Regions:
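Intrinsically disordered, low-complexity Pro/Gly/Ser/Thr-rich segments with frequent PxxP/GP/PP motifs
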Residues: 1-28, 32-37
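Beta-strand/loop-rich accessory regions of lumenal/periplasmic or secreted enzymes
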Residues: 12-18, 33, 47-298
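Terminal amphipathic helices with adjacent charged low-complexity linkers/tails
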Residues: 40-42
Length: 298
């Protein structure tokens, strides 16, 4: 073994104040070996040189442009429309979420496929201690109902749509088949409908639509069973199949997790959406990427 001090030739003063910077170090074979070609990476590491600086709030950079057109806010109207230069987004008052979204006349979210709160995933081997409770509490069949709303055009030109949404299943269910059988059956307990004190989420959702077409969601999610272990918590939505190219800035390209991620570096990665799926014989964790700064579908 030998040691050597190497000076990396970069200038601190040339770095952007808002950007983050990493240094990637690789040790490669100098010549072809029986087991690998010349240039094969034997070891590598990524070092953080500088963290990203604070960026302006979206309200500071997205508030310029033509005044937004707001309609559908009268009592009895169920669909609210917000139109701007080159885009239109509609909201379903009864669900408290986006109903459809178009940019330049092209649907990005088709009618009825907007974001919904979701707390379910397929169970894997490590879930044998608690997966039955997901179905007992109806996580597989949440129904979303806005119980109040507030809509207002702001002085800065944006539009705010605030909803309180209750998410609860009609009833619980029993899942049979166990963890390892490969076959499971969900039996709905429709004879025992849920009441107000059964499990539910209550979410305060604030949507802000800006003149340039940016849409921001702030969500505060609570439940009446704070000790219930959830398999996941987030939002799901459907987009047209043609958006099959996936680009993200985060750890990759191999899927990684909070306890197994350091081998995958933070870079801009590109993949097909279909290639993020691995067809395991039984459900297993896959497709996750840690420390993602942004992602895009095209």
């Amino acid at each position: 073994r030998t040691r050597k001090l190497v000076t990396v030739p970069y200038m601190n003063q040339s770095l952007s104040g808002q950007s983050e910077y990493f240094l990637k170090i690789q040790f490669c074979l100098k010549e072809k070996m029986p087991w690998a070609d010349k240039g094969y990476v034997v070891a590598e590491e990524q070092l953080l040189i500088k963290e990203a600086g604070s960026r302006p709030a979206i309200s500071e950079v997205a508030s310029s442009g033509k005044k937004l057109e707001l309609s559908g806010i009268k009592p009895g109207d169920n669909i609210v429309s917000v139109k701007g230069a080159g885009f239109e987004v509609t909201f379903d008052k009864s669900a408290g979420s986006i109903y459809s979204l178009k940019y330049n006349g092209e649907f990005i979210i088709t009618e009825g496929n907007g974001p919904e709160l979701n707390a379910l995933r397929a169970f894997v081997n490590n879930d044998n201690w608690f997966f039955s409770s997901w179905f007992d509490n109806g996580l597989h069949n949440l129904r979303h109902k806005a119980i109040s709303h507030y809509i207002q055009a702001q002085e800065n030109g944006s539009v705010i749509l605030s909803f309180t949404v209750e998410s609860q299943a009609p009833n619980g269910a029993f899942i049979s088949g166990g963890m390892y059988s490969g076959k499971n059956r969900i039996e709905e307990r429709s004879d025992r409908p849920f009441e107000s004190d059964d499990f539910k989420f209550v979410t305060n959702q604030i949507w802000t639509v800006y003149q340039d077409g940016s849409i921001e969601l702030e969500a505060s999610i609570t439940s009446n069973r704070p000790n219930l272990a959830l398999p996941r918590l987030g939002y799901v939505m459907k987009v047209p199949r043609k958006f099959g190219d996936f680009t993200y800035y985060g750890r990759g390209p191999i899927d990684n997790y909070s306890d197994r991620k350091s081998s995958q570096f933070i870079e801009i990665h590109k993949n097909k959406v279909a290639n993020e799926f691995i067809n395991f014989p039984k459900p297993q964790n896959m497709g996750n990427h840690e420390d993602v700064r942004w992602c895009a579908l095209t």
